[in-house]
Each structure stands twice: as structure tokens, then as C-alpha cells.
Amino acid sequence: RVMAEPHIVLRTSRLAKCVGERFASRCIDAVMAGVSFTQIDVLDEARRMGMPWDEAVGFDHSSALSLDMLSRDAMLEGATFMINDEVRERINIADMAFSVDRVVSRLSECMTLRIGDLIYLGAPEQFEVKIGDNYKVAIGDKVLLNFDIK
């Protein structure tokens, strides 16, 4: 069983380590649309055995990322995830548990962010993947990802 999660993806524009929240937005220069895939059965087994989740989330084609990028301000418009042209989720930055600035700041405390790194913002919901489905992810009114599940 495979589940999909839509994401707003941030691209870092500079080297960053221990960046304060008030400066964190300066580290982002673009946003993209993304979808990550998780093998739930593999994840459940890894959890049960106390093992790493790598195989459940890091397999071939485990993530889709738009080629088009928008300015960082576009993330304020939020994202829409559609399956077969039906809106299944709306992601609003203001509704996230942690602000983008907090996420970037915290990540920069744990690791050095480098130019071009991608940050997949958390997704509130997962959707079961079905062969033949069409996925679209839009930021604002621009569809950035449009692909079929094969």
C-alpha cells in the first residue's frame, strides 16, 4: 500500500546555519509543488522493528517535484491538491503548525542548509495511491505538477 502527500516545497538560496526566525525568509528564493510517496507496509514493519524508515520513504520515484518554480511570495497563496480533477486538499501556509520562518530556522540549527536544498513543508493528509489516477498540484492558480499514476 502506497500513500501520497502533497507539499509546498521551498528552495534555499544561500548557505545558512543557525539562522534566526526573523531572517529565515531571506534563505528562500523559490517555491515548487511536490508529492511524496510512502510505502505504508514497509513503514509499519520498520516501526515495529525499531528500524529506520529509509526504505519506506526513500525508494525510486518516491517523490515528484515540479520543474517550474515561483517566487517565494507565491506560497502565501497556498496550494491545491487534486486527484482526477477533484480537490482533495488545500494547503494554507497560515494554518500550518509551524511558520515557514520557524521551520527554516529550526532546520538551520540541525544542519547546514546549502544553496539549492529543498524543504518539503509538512502535509496534513495522506491519500491512497491508485493506478490510473491523475494528480495535480497548484500553487495559487498555477498548476505546477500534473501526472498520472502508472
Positions of the model-derived regions?
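Catalytic-core "active-site belt" of small-molecule-metabolizing enzymes
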Residues: 1-114, 118, 125-150
